[in-house]
């Protein structure tokens, strides 16, 4: 599996950090360093808002799914540019069928807001429009798929 992915760059999302802190990292595997970091929303489950992420792989759960993802094709959807996500683990195997995608949302700020949280998603890793442009530059330039790893 690993041989099929970009060996220089990985996207890491650390859901153990508060949503108001940068927790989505563009990581340089060759230099063992963070290239760029930003905020990312988490799923709130069946509530209107949750300070902490809710995790599930079930359809209609509104929860974030932990695990590794292959970033798939881009498309233009409800929130503009988005990338399909293909779950590679038992904890996120339903992501594609759940329509869990990587997309931006204008209410996700560019700067950290901690101790204040940011908005929630319905399970998608949702970033600011400017950070999605940074991700797009990496994804579109890569000859191999980029791996996204969401962990807690």
Locations of regions flagged by a protein language model:
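Cell wall/extracellular polymer interaction/catalysis modules
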Residues: 1-122, 129-140, 146, 152
């Amino acid at each position: 599996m690993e041989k099929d992915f970009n060996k220089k760059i990985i996207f890491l999302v650390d859901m153990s950090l508060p949503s108001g802190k940068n927790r989505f990292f563009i990581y340089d595997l060759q230099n063992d360093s963070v290239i760029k970091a930003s905020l990312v929303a988490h799923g709130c489950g069946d509530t209107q808002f949750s300070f902490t992420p809710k995790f599930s792989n079930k359809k209609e759960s509104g929860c974030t799914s932990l695990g590794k993802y292959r970033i798939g094709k881009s498309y233009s959807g409800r929130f503009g540019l988005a990338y399909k996500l293909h779950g590679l683990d038992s904890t996120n195997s339903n992501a594609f069928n759940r329509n869990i995608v990587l997309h931006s949302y204008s209410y996700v700020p560019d700067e950290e807001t901690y101790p204040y949280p940011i908005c929630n998603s319905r399970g998608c890793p949702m970033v600011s429009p400017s950070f999605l442009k940074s991700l797009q530059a990496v994804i579109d330039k890569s000859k191999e798929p980029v791996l996204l790893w969401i962990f807690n």
